[in-house]
Amino acid sequence: MKIHFVGIGGIGMSALALHEFFSGNEVYGSNIEETERTTYLKKLKIPVFIPHSEENWFDPDVLVKTPAVHEDNPEIIRARKENVPVENRLSYFKVILKRENREEFAVTGTDGKTTTTAMIAHVLKELNRSPTAFLGGIMDSLEHGNYESGKGPVVYELDESEETFSEFSPNYLIITNARGDHLENYANSISRYRAAFERISRNSDLVITFAEDELTSHLGNVTFGVRKGMYTLEMRSASRSGQRAIIEKNRKRYAELKLRIPGFHNILNALAVTALFDSLGYDLEEVLKALERFPGVRRRFSISYHDPENNIYVVDDYAHTPEEIKNLLQTAKEVFENEKVVVIFQPHRYSRLEREDGNFARALQLADEVIVTEVYDAFEEKRPNVSGKIIWDSLMNLGKEAKFVDDLSRLNSVIVPRDNTVFLFVGAGDIIHYSKKFVETLQSSTNSPSRVSGSKR
């Protein structure tokens, strides 16, 4: 079969393309711009065309499109004209899962999907279960970063931004939380949003939920939480080299959980995974050993640069909701106790910024300094009076030192390199490109007297 992927450079779409390619199908696709994934696909000899054009056409049997691609896309128009079936990403993914007909592990929810899914895939690999994994991020221990083909269970994350996620039927499901992100895709109805989680829960044999989540805690056969739930945490300690916590099961001391990666939110992600595998009867000791070796996911508190002489760090993180940003900054303050934390934040989607109102500023005020850029639109139409400046205004009202940069080409001239400082580049858009440019600046001026000397807090 010949499959045309429109938006093939996205992290989710590229995983589907890789699966179909390694399943023996003829695969090609297009993207609006080059990405790390388009470069990788080309190395595998998968044809990728930049940008979209009606000439990117080789008589496919089906066209698969990302939700970011609209009906006015020239390739969609041509497919309609030539009566080629057009499938959305999730609807086509259901076709794949039906064809594979295997045991399924899935993760959905607002925060922590990618890391939790990666943990499940990692544990199954370590336990020689040979999973096929579809990941919404890059984990270096997966053969293709966001995808690996195996003969065992299928592991995937389900993006709740599309209401059709509720039509899936995984055997085992973790719902990390549900905070109403993407509510605009549910006609701004919280009851409709809640109903989608209820539907997918009914479709699953085992559901693990966060006991402290208002919308979904009641849906779980098994629950986890800080103080509430079947699986809880008794105490936790953390350092730069990792963290550990005592797990209680039904209020009794049960096991010790160790992780290399930082962040209390990651202990909760790992607790959910532990609850899942323990409930399924896996060897708990082997599961915990595997989690201790979990390498993490790129752009999840990824240190991309460290100058030990001047004590400067650059950290990249995909956080793009207020809760994720709060978790990120709490982690940064825990890991970097003596350094100043400067956040460079790129808001993602006008709809999210408008809906969350002052929540971003309240999360960002945990930083010592904040630089806010203009919104990364993610193919949304610009909305009147919705701008990154909203966050800057709120931060200033909170008395937080902040700057607003409306032109990203000026960003690196605004960031002042200084000693004893952690620079956090945060967002789900293209902020990573500017992080790389900043690292290049630091590397070229390591011994420059222009660097500002900052005192440790």
Curated annotation (Swiss-Prot):
GO terms for biological process: cell division; cell wall organization; peptidoglycan biosynthetic process; regulation of cell shape. Keywords: ATP-binding, Cell cycle, Cell division, Cell shape, Cell wall biogenesis/degradation, Cytoplasm, Ligase, Nucleotide-binding, Peptidoglycan synthesis. GO terms for molecular function: ATP binding; UDP-N-acetylmuramate-L-alanine ligase activity. Its EC number is 6.3.2.8. The keyword Cell division applies. Its main location: cytoplasm. Disulfide bonds: none annotated. One of its GO terms (cellular component) is cytoplasm. ATP binds at residues 109-115. Gene3D superfamilies: Mur ligase, C-terminal domain (3.90.190.20), Mur-like, catalytic domain (3.40.1190.10), NAD(P)-binding Rossmann-like Domain (3.40.50.720). Belongs to the MurCDEF family. Cell wall formation. This is UDP-N-acetylmuramate--L-alanine ligase.
